[in-house]
C-alpha cells in the first residue's frame, strides 16, 4: 500500500524537527536553553522556518534584527568574513539548495521588499509571506460553547 509519504518538503521538515528534538535533549542535559538563529527577515518577514522544527526555540535573540543588521553587528564583533558572507542554507535538502533557491529571492531583495512598498519584489515577498503566515501566528484555539462543555 502506497500511503503517499514521499513528500520532499515533508522529509525536509522532518529533518528540521529531528534537529529540534536533538537540541532540546542537549539543552535538557546541560540545564540550558535552545537559542534561535532566526532574524526579522527570515522568521517574521517570510516565515522561512519549519513549524515545530527550527522555529521551536526558547529564546530568539536576533529576531528583531534584519539580516543586514545581523551582518553589521557581526562585522563590529570581528566575526570572520567567511562566516558573514556564507551562503544561507538550511541544510535540509540532498541537493544542497540554498535559501535563495528555495524562496526565489535573496534576503537582500526580501528585506528591501519588506520596507519598500515600491520594490519590484514586493508582490513576490507578500506572496511568500501569505503562504507562511500560519507559522507566524499563534495556534488557533477552538472555543467550545459552554452548553456543549457542560454536557
Region roles according to the model:
Residues 1-17, 21-24, 28-33, 37-41, ...:
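ATP/NTP-dependent adenylation/nucleotidyl-transfer catalytic domains that generate, transfer
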